UniProtKB/Swiss-Prot annotation:
CDD domains: cinA. Disulfide bonds: none annotated. This is CinA-like protein. InterPro entries: CinA, CinA-like_C, CinA_C, CinA_KH, Competence-induced_CinA, MoaB/Mog-like_dom_sf, MoaB/Mog_dom. It comes from Desulfovibrio desulfuricans (strain ATCC 27774 / DSM 6949 / MB). PANTHER family: NICOTINAMIDE-NUCLEOTIDE AMIDOHYDROLASE PNCC (PTHR13939), NMN AMIDOHYDROLASE-LIKE PROTEIN YFAY (PTHR13939:SF0). The lineage of its organism: Bacteria, Pseudomonadati, Thermodesulfobacteriota, Desulfovibrionia, Desulfovibrionales.
């Protein structure tokens, strides 16, 4: 099935709010094996919304709108959809009941009540995180317009609870979707290795890159879940076999989730010393459930004095080699492990930019070290062509640190080579 997304909100056009809704919906459609044709963004203007809606209905089987379902005058998505589809708004009794339950004994303003009015013939989607229900409105035979609230905290539960099951039923098939996640190979190299697998129609195999990682989604359709999984799993195994040990998991949330689980399984602890990443690595670890079992100390040692006082980095080493050096990265990893009683220590120091670089130590140069009781490993991240920004450099460095620890605990070589312009050891 073909789908289009229409994101509604002037704040999106002005850049005041990042359009994460389209990303969430796009990922959900991809997981269902649907083809996303276009994403439109329109302001709070009924005429422009109507034009975008009519254009989308000429091409797509499913049109999904996000935003514009609230109680204010500029929330006009339902009214516009009702007009375009010829489905007048009607009070939806169950939505009204839920709205009254939400407000309890508090008075409900008249404009709040309009949220319980839905286009005639709609299938309502309850909003367990807010007041505005979503709905699916039938268009011509086999066509639907799905209306979702704008706040991600409301949209995401509705997607999971109501929209995805609805679309699965409408598609007449059960979808099995697997995400193979990798770090250490570029999209081009990966695509060459799995080129023949991407030619299949069921399952489909689609590689794409994000945040210096490369993902491969395998999606199969069948009459039931068991049959869909049986179609997909041999292809997932083939992808893993072709890509090798750069694969760090299937249907996992990220490198940090894998590392925390490895630490828990091995009953090992981690301490971290960061300079240029400013606590990002520690944040990624502590975002994971169960992190407190394996992670006790995370230090941001920006200043040389902090590196010496808190980690034991020798002053003469800093004076001789500078804070951004392999020697200091190693000392940070060893110092944080030894001083704070952990099994593993990670140290990161570099020039995240955009300023501060020199000819000898350019912007983007980062040293990442991993220490255990009997060894220290180092990766050097050197700038590869165009500087991609401070956040990119910090994210990449933290991912390298996680990957080094992941590989060590899996019994793989830590100082691996890199392809497609990723940093070289």
């Amino acid at each position: 099935m073909r789908a289009e997304i229409i994101s509604v909100g002037t704040e999106l056009l002005l850049g005041h709010t990042i359009n994460t809704d389209a990303a969430h919906v796009g990922r959900a459609l991809s997981a269902l094996g649907m083809d996303l044709l276009q994403v439109h963004t329109v302001g709070d203007n009924a005429g422009r919304l109507e034009a975008a809606l009519r254009e989308a209905l000429n091409c797509a089987d499913v049109v999904i709108t996000t935003g514009g379902l609230g109680p204010t005058d500029d929330d006009m998505t339902k009214e516009t959809v009702a007009r375009v589809l010829g489905a007048p708004l009607e009070e939806h009794k169950d939505s009204l009941r839920r709205l009254r339950e939400y407000f309890g004994s508090r008075p409900i303003a008249a404009n709040q009540l309009k949220q319980a009015w839905l286009p005639r013939g709609s299938t309502a989607f309850p909003n367990r995180a807010g007041t505005a229900p979503g709905c699916a409105v039938p268009g011509k035979p086999g066509q639907w317009v799905i209306l979702l609230p704008g706040p991600p905290s409301e949209l995401l539960p509705m997607l999971e609870d109501s929209v995805m099951p609805f679309l699965q039923r409408m598609g007449g098939a059960v979808i099995a979707s697997f995400m193979v996640r990798t770090f250490g190979i570029g999209e081009g190299s990966a695509a060459l290795r799995i080129a023949d697998l991407t030619e299949g129609a069921n399952p489909t195999v689609a590689p794409y890159a994000s945040d210096a990682e490369m993902f491969v989604r395998v999606t199969a359709k069948a009459e039931n879940a068991e049959a869909a999984e049986a179609l997909a799993k041999p292809v997932v195994d083939a992808v893993r076999g072709r890509l090798g040990d750069v694969v760090y998991g299937v249907n996992v949330s990220g490198l940090e989730a894998v590392v925390v689980e490895q630490l828990r399984q091995h009953r090992r602890s981690l301490a971290i010393a960061e300079s240029c990443t400013g606590g990002l690595l520690a944040k990624r670890i502590t975002d994971q459930p169960g992190a407190s079992e394996v992670f006790g100390y995370g230090l941001i040692t920006y200043a040389n004095e902090a590196k010496t006082r808190l980690l034991g980095v020798p002053e003469e080493q800093l004076a001789c080699y500078g804070a951004v050096s392999p020697q200091v990265a190693r000392s940070m990893a060893v110092g944080v492990r030894e001083r704070y009683g952990a099994d593993y220590g990670l140290g990161i120091t570099g020039v995240a930019g955009p300023g501060g670089g020199t000819e000898e130590k350019p912007v983007g140069l980062v040293y990442v070290a991993l220490s255990c009781s009997n060894a220290v490993w180092l990766r050097v991240l050197r700038p590869q062509g165009r500087y991609l920004g401070r956040e990119w450099t910090r994210r990449l460095a933290s991912s390298h640190a996680l990957d080094m620890l992941r590989r060590h605990m899996a019994g793989l070589p830590v100082e691996a080579g890199w392809a497609d312009g990723l940093p070289q050891d």
